[in-house]
Amino acid sequence: MDATQPTLVAEDVHKNFGTLEILKGISLTANKGDVVSIIGSSGSGKSTFLRCMNFLETPNKGRIAVGQEEVVVKTDAAGRLIGVDRKKIERMRMQLGMVFQSFNLWGHMTVLQNVMEGPLHVLKQPKGEVRDRAMDFLDKVGIANKHAAYPSQLSGGQQQRVSIARALAMQPSALLFDEPTSALDPELVGEVLKVIRKLAEEGRTMVVVTHEMGFARDVSSKVLFLEKGQIEEQGTPQEVFQNPTSPRCRAFLSSVL
């Protein structure tokens, strides 16, 4: 990937569910090493926007670019993509590691098997190489000692760390986190945020939908505040948290900080 080229671009993204307009033409650019946090009230469109970036939700309009691959979205009356190469979308998805709030691990596989699955069967990489790298990523997230366990034997925080290792194993250009701590007991939140902070320090490109304001303030290079499907405020953490210009953003922050 060209070092001068943005890692991820979402431009003028619109999304409707029936007659309800969820996203009203919002844009984001993440350059290499950026950590972009998306904050806002529940129902503001944060997760929908994130899911549109890798086509888990199909935008009704917009442009998504990952490295040198891009899709300019056109849809029919039913909201289905038209004139788009599905293989291009698959190539884009492989460059975006996704971490969900609900872990989404395969319950019938061990921790190690979960992390190896994508590189083995999607990337078709050699098993020995995949296993070694999977153990390295499990070690990175502090859970290599649980490689033979099954997800049901782990705490929520441990399961989420496995899902982060699984995303890393695909060696993506960027990581997308959809409220990665919201399903966790409060005492387990810290262990997951510690891993994500470590990834930020390594220079990984990340887009994080989060309710953890301290994390967004301390780790982000850029913060977006969404309100009713629009970007109401954006800037550096200092600009957004210390000197927001939007009354709605000020009200939101005063209620959560």
UniProtKB/Swiss-Prot annotation:
* Signal peptide coordinates: none
List, alphabetically, the SUPFAM superfamilies matched: P-loop containing nucleoside triphosphate hydrolases
Q: Report how it sits in the membrane.
A: Peripheral membrane protein
Any one of the GO CC terms: plasma membrane
| Locations listed in the record | Cell inner membrane
Residue positions binding ATP = 40-47
Q: Which residues form the ABC transporter domain?
A: 8-253
Q: Which UniProt keywords apply?
A: ATP-binding, Cell inner membrane, Cell membrane, Membrane, Nucleotide-binding, Plasmid, Transport
The UniProt entry's sequence similarity note says:
Belongs to the ABC transporter superfamily.
What does the protein in this record do?
A: Component of the nopaline active transport system probably consisting of four subunits: Q, M, P and T. This system is also capable of transporting octopine provided that catabolic functions are induced with nopaline.
What is the protein named?
A: Nopaline permease ATP-binding protein P
